[in-house]
Amino acid sequence: MASIDFRNKINWHRRYRSPQGVKTEHEILRIFESDRGRIINSPAIRRLQQKTQVFPLERNAAVRTRLTHSMEVQQVGRYIAKEILSRLKEQNRLEEYGLDALTGPFESIVEMACLMHDIGNPPFGHFGEAAINDWFRQWLHPEDAESQPLTHDRCVVSSLRLQEGEENLNDIRRKVRQDICHFEGNAQGIRLVHTLMRMNLTWAQVGGILKYTRPAWWRGPVPDSHRYLMKKPGYYLSEEKYIARLRKELQLAPYSRFPLTWIMEAADDISYCVADLEDAVEKRIFSVEQLYHHLYHAWGHHEKDSLFELVVGNAWEKSRANTLSRSTEDQFFMYLRVNTLNKLVSYAAQRFIDNLPQIFAGTFNQALLEDASGFSRLLELYKNVAVEHVFSHPDVEQLELQGYRVISGLLDIYQPLLSLSLNDFRELVEKERLKRFPIESRLFQKLSTRHRLAYVEVVSKLPTDSAEYPVLEYYYRCRLIQDYISGMTDLYAWDEYRRLMAVEQ
């Protein structure tokens, strides 16, 4: 096992205009402060305030949005990072691990990774993701890319349809179709940071949000050694070269993860489990007393001084006994949050330290809070109660179905841009309006300037005389539409759908 030296991981260089020379501890910290400013002031972070956490189109400001959730994750991530550093300091291992002058950047990378962890999520959360993928699967039929004979290919796009005698090109077609039909919020986050927003963050900071290490075009089984790390797509074909450079800069083996990403993941797991239940009480899906009974019965066998009694039972008893001028709801969730954090943060920090050789190598093939311990069981308890009593509630399911229809409907509306021939779309991009395509011209004008420029830049660099050109042009055209629609807030997507469908406001 190679030695653990975080100076090889906390890489403060950037893709463009990178700082040069040897830097002092203070200068390195200033570089990461610059990252913080770029992230906090980015439009992608601001848009999180109108994106779904659990309840779409929620008008009650007390219920969490993606932004307030991300801020809570940021705080928990900071807490875990500080706990890890404190324990390593007590063990006199900070210098051994190359962290003695990097404690500030260590904390900052974790905090900002937590704040950014959801920036790629589309409107309406996972149902928005499903709508995008289902729509493009019906359009491109990626499963037919393996069909024999090739005449069974139902793809409606001629440039992506498999052709006899074009095996090399067919491999690219398969890759492109698979990639487009696997939109994923984490992969879109990488695309936002590098390609669309051009934030030019340090390599270490971007490494912190590369949660999954499987490329979106992957076909077939994943290796058992990386099954957890590769359970979802982590980046797209469009960012393949950037990720290859990222791996080199952070000394990451293929399909391995950046060490601090495990902390971000644990902070997210801890935060949303309690928060989803609190929001459900705020929405009157159930009362706090009903919630306690749901948790009690779901835990199963009860023993004195069990983790359930120390965390949930303690919160329930204190909230009932406390005579402070606060509601039982407020007190219960205050105590539940404090008790949960104290137990799970401590456990996550120790798991990080105990498994540091594998984590540093990027090969630890599970989450910090995913094992056979009671702490993992407590987290699963919260998740299971939320699944059974919150996510399955008729009001929540109705809003999710509406969100799915909105995203599917918007893709239907913008489909004419995907139906244009290569030459017609290229002419539309150059002239921005064409009389013979009045609908397509108006749809093109509605696309974000940032997204259009990203498309133009990458396509202009493709060799037009190459056989791959029509395939890759269409790939980036699909990305253009996905970028635009996934970047909408819930409310904007809802309003845009109603406007374009001529539904009365």
From Swiss-Prot:
| Keywords on record | Hydrolase, Magnesium
Q: What is its EC number?
A: 3.1.5.1
Q: Which reaction does it catalyse?
A: dGTP + H2O = 2'-deoxyguanosine + triphosphate + H(+)
Q: Which residues form the HD domain?
A: 66-273
A Pfam family of the record is HD
User: Which InterPro entries does this entry report, sorted A to Z?
Assistant: dGTP_triP_hydro_central_sf (IPR023293), dGTPase (IPR006261), dGTPase-like (IPR050135), dNTPase_1 (IPR020779), HD/PDEase_dom (IPR003607), HD_domain (IPR006674)
GO molecular function per UniProt: dGTPase activity; magnesium ion binding
Where is the chain membrane-spanning? none
By its UniProt entry, which CDD domains does this protein fall under?
A: HDc (cd00077)
Which positions are tagged coiled coil?
none
Any single GO BP term: dGTP catabolic process
Using the UniProt record, name the top-level EC class of this enzyme in a single word: hydrolase
Leader sequence residues: none
The function of this protein is: dGTPase preferentially hydrolyzes dGTP over the other canonical NTPs.
Note the subunit structure.
Answer: Homotetramer.
What family is it from? Belongs to the dGTPase family. Type 1 subfamily.
What name has this protein been given in UniProt?
A: Deoxyguanosinetriphosphate triphosphohydrolase
Organism listed in the record: Salmonella paratyphi A (strain AKU_12601)
Lineage start: Bacteria, Pseudomonadati, Pseudomonadota, Gammaproteobacteria, Enterobacterales
